[in-house]
């Protein structure tokens, strides 16, 4: 029980103006010694935007579609999470030491906190963006079950914090826009969660082309099936059920909850939706990004 008391619900800490989980903020110092390699591939997302999904797709690509190899370890061991650090579990940097090249890496960090070495080495990036309303709802449920986060409070208060960028990793609006801008000068494949839901095979083909690999069509079809939400939700190597309960309590909300586009409509009130839309229009003014909030 002592460990639970030790880790449970610490307040966010600000680093360069960005709020972060306390333990992740502590990882940023050691992360400065990280050395990227030109053959690394970085998976970047704002939280709750399809990170685990695209991680599993890329690991399958790197393993040539071999399902057995993809069952070698949980996804967070196969794709090291750069800024990850909580008591009693190997940190992202520690996991990285045992990861053979070519490495898949994961981050949610905004550019202000990203290790410069990743940009200097021109590391390829697969970025996935998801519509803000579904992210907010999914993040709210995740805050409830992941005990390294502060308690989210009511949905209404959490939504206000989300809109103000006062949740872990800060502003969704800034995150999606700055990585979009980076794609003009850096090798970034910018994908949309909704496109992946609509036509996963098409999006997997884009990823294959981006990483310079090819697989037989029947292998790609197998990947589409194996990386479907239904399959990943029941796969202990992707659904985070191997994580100890004092960190993630799946009885509160499963890590893989619904995996759909448009679920926000079951949560937002009409008034919240109108307020959100007005605020969204201001924050995204002048940005060429376009999101679909349902399919």
Swiss-Prot record:
3'-phosphoadenylyl sulfate binds at residues 48-53, 130, 138, 193, 227-232, 255-259. The active site is at 108 (proton acceptor). Substrate binds at residues 106-108. The keyword Lyase does not apply. The keyword Amino-acid biosynthesis does not apply. One of its GO terms (molecular function) is sulfotransferase activity. It comes from the Eukaryota. Its EC number is 2.8.2.1. It is an enzyme of class 2 (transferase). Its main location: cytoplasm. Pfam families: Sulfotransfer_1. It catalyses: a phenol + 3'-phosphoadenylyl sulfate = an aryl sulfate + adenosine 3',5'-bisphosphate + H(+). One of its GO terms (biological process) is amine biosynthetic process. It is found in: Cytoplasm. GO terms for cellular component: cytoplasm; cytosol. Keywords: Catecholamine metabolism, Cytoplasm, Lipid metabolism, Steroid metabolism, Transferase. PANTHER family: SULFOTRANSFERASE SULT (PTHR11783). Homodimer. Sulfotransferase that utilizes 3'-phospho-5'-adenylyl sulfate (PAPS) as sulfonate donor to catalyze the sulfate conjugation of catecholamines, phenolic drugs and neurotransmitters. Is also responsible for the sulfonation and activation of minoxidil. Mediates the metabolic activation of carcinogenic N-hydroxyarylamines to DNA binding products and could so participate as modulating factor of cancer risk. Belongs to the sulfotransferase 1 family. This is Sulfotransferase 1A2. The gene is SULT1A2.
